[in-house]
């Protein structure tokens, strides 16, 4: 499974390489 880097869009916490999937202005993004 591929993971998303910080600043990239995500749909769940498990998708993020580091940090968590959090709600931002434009949907959800990975933030550490």
UniProtKB/Swiss-Prot annotation:
Expressed by the venom gland. Disulfide bonds join 3-17, 10-21, 16-30. Keywords: Disulfide bond, Knottin, Neurotoxin, Secreted, Toxin. One of its GO terms (molecular function) is toxin activity. It is found in: Secreted. It holds the Pfam family Toxin_29. GO terms for cellular component: extracellular region. It comes from the Eukaryota. The keyword Ribosomal protein does not apply. Belongs to the neurotoxin 17 (21C2) family. May act as a neurotoxin. The presence of a 'disulfide through disulfide knot' structurally defines this protein as a knottin. This is U3-ctenitoxin-Pk1a. It comes from Phoneutria keyserlingi. The lineage of its organism: Eukaryota, Metazoa, Ecdysozoa, Arthropoda, Chelicerata.
